[in-house]
A protein has these predicted regions:
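Aromatic (phenylalanine/tyrosine) cluster motif
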Residues: 2-5, 14, 19
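Mixed-charge, low-complexity segments
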Residues: 24-94, 109-133, 154-307
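Short beta-strand scaffold segments in enzyme catalytic cores
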Residues: 137-140
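Active-site beta-strand-loop-beta-strand hairpin of nuclease catalytic cores
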Residues: 144-148
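Hydrophobic alpha-helical packing residues
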Residues: 104-108
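Beta-strand scaffold of nucleotide-dependent catalytic cores
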Residues: 150-152
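Charged/polar low-complexity intrinsically disordered segments
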Residues: 7-10, 23
């Protein structure tokens, strides 16, 4: 497994430089980092250390919600960094994996971290016989000769800590236990549930290119059967709990797996929950429009859906 890792390491170095140059062309580094730190409430040192990565990784999904409002409404999801910064930071909205992890990648690289973007096949709650495409973005981060996987956006199963690249070893995070397994050249991220280990996604170590994410994003946001076009999914982590809105139903789950649920019957109360519990503020008109859509939806997604 580590032989494969070394094979792609040199390629990743050159790739990262190209990716960063494309993404940061028109954005001031200092202003970018300052605005991001203010958005997530980070006040620590600006250095490429494990401790800093861990702090950012827990703060990001607490402050910036995972949400798919744009594709659910039929809008495009641009992946250029300027658009993502405007949406997730300045307009204080959320997004899904390609948006969150593109932002996180740019932040880490500007802080001096050695980061490689990767792409994965989602397997969460997908039958083993069903094939899936490359529709999820994650990051590999090198710190002092050790490799870590960072991922701040997988819906209700989002990591709140980087995971070290060690195989078959349970790793405890603030929101659950994960492990990384390997079959041939394929790595699998698994999450421990009450019914056992469940595979979240599968991936390799070859660095992904921007075009890979553009293709995955286009498919995810336009394919008629995509969950992101058929159900509204909004989630956020808070200390000790995960919070999720699927259409009109809010679920709060603690680390023991205990949950409480409430289905909303009117737009004002629903919008207030989004604002106070999930950190997402909508205008009255937008809330009414979205609530009408979700309350009429016939395709209720599982409370555990991620993406």
């Amino acid at each position: 497994s580590f032989y494969l890792y070394k094979q792609v390491e040199q390629t990743a170095v050159f790739h990262n430089r190209d990716f960063l140059r494309c993404q940061m062309t028109a954005i001031s580094t200092a202003a970018f980092l300052d605005s991001y730190f203010a958005r997530i409430g980070y006040q620590g040192p600006v250095e490429p250390s494990l401790e800093v990565l861990q702090q950012l990784h827990v703060l990001h999904p607490q402050a910036i919600p995972f949400e798919n409002i744009a594709p659910y409404r039929g809008d495009s999801v641009p992946l250029d960094l300027a658009a993502i910064v405007d949406k997730l930071i300045h307009r204080r909205r959320g997004g899904y994996c390609f948006e969150h992890n593109t932002l996180f990648l740019a932040v880490l690289q500007q802080m001096g971290f050695n980061v490689t973007p990767l792409i994965a096949r989602v397997r969460w709650q997908v039958p083993a016989e069903v094939e899936t495409g490359l529709t999820h973005m994650l990051l590999r981060v090198e710190i002092e000769g050790r490799s870590w996987f960072a991922d701040v956006a997988f819906g209700s199963t989002t990591q709140t800590a980087p995971l070290e690249f060690v195989l078959d070893t349970p790793q405890t995070t603030p929101h659950g236990i994960y492990r990384i397994t390997q079959t041939r050249e394929v790595l699998s991220l698994q999450f421990q549930t009450r019914s056992g280990w469940q595979t979240v996604y599968q991936y390799g170590l070859a660095p992904a290119s921007q075009i890979d994410f553009e293709i995955g994003n286009w498919y995810t946001s336009t394919y008629p059967q995509s969950v992101f076009l058929n159900s509204l999914l909004i989630s956020r982590t808070q200390p000790g709990i995960r919070e999720l809105m699927v259409n009109d139903t809010y679920t709060q789950r603690d680390n023991a797996g205990l949950s409480q649920r409430h289905q909303y019957k009117d737009a004002p109360a629903w919008a207030e929950c989004l604002q106070t519990r999930l950190g997402l503020t909508l205008s009255r008109e937008e809330a009414q429009e979205l609530f009408l859509c979700v309350s009429q939806s016939q395709d209720a997604a599982s409370e555990l859906t991620g993406g």
